[in-house]
A protein has these predicted regions:
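Phosphodiester-processing cores and adjacent nucleic acid-binding clamps
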Residues: 1-190
């Protein structure tokens, strides 16, 4: 698997979702001949220090990230009918500026934006976008949800908005194939 890198990975720190433990994640990347691996736990960065140390100790490039929850309106809006469902977005750090911005976003999500989950909004993403790369995420991302709803143009507009927020070359559409029917449906559209 030379040249392939897992960029959307949930560890044991993604409660009720991730199962891989950090030492095993790093060891598996080595076994597969990968030179880097990311950690992108849901809404939290609890495991990044252990991950960074484990990867560095084994000669693997650690890519620090987080799968954030994006509020449908603003992170301060908390009306059940409109704000109870958030959208996923994967953020990866390109450099130390990105790391500091990701810490800021995740901290704001927990201290200001929490409503069912720690949430950020598009304005915060715009403000703290330097040094970050964004991926469109899983079926719970805004773009896949729009595609599933038959809203191709709205999905396209959201992709263009993310490209504008993060800058040219810093936003990517994510393809996943876990054998899920919905993924097979939207992947050709992505």
């Amino acid at each position: 698997m030379s040249g392939f890198v897992h960029l959307h990975v949930h560890s044991e720190y993604s409660l009720l979702d991730g199962a891989c433990r950090i030492p095993g994640l790093v060891d598996t990347a080595i076994e597969l001949g990968q030179t880097a691996v990311a950690i992108t736990d849901h809404g939290a960065m609890y495991g990044v220090i252990d991950f960074y140390k484990a990867a560095k100790a084994k000669g693997i490039k650690p890519i620090i990230g987080c799968e954030v929850y994006v509020a449908p309106r603003t992170h301060l809006d908390k009306v059940h009918e409109y704000d109870s469902e958030s959208r996923h977005l994967v953020l990866l750090c390109k450099n130390n500026v990105g790391y500091q911005n990701l810490i800021q976003l995740v901290s704001l999500a927990w201290t200001e934006g929490f409503y069912n989950k720690p949430r950020v909004d598009d304005e915060q993403l715009r403000r703290y976008s330097d040094g970050l790369i964004a991926l469109s995420a899983c079926l719970a991302g805004e773009i896949p949800r729009r595609l599933l709803a038959g809203e191709y143009e709205a999905a396209k507009q959201k992709a263009l908005q993310y490209q504008e927020i993060f800058g040219e070359g810093n936003f990517y559409l994510e393809l996943q194939d876990h054998g899920i029917r919905e993924q097979k449906y939207i992947n050709p559209m992505i």
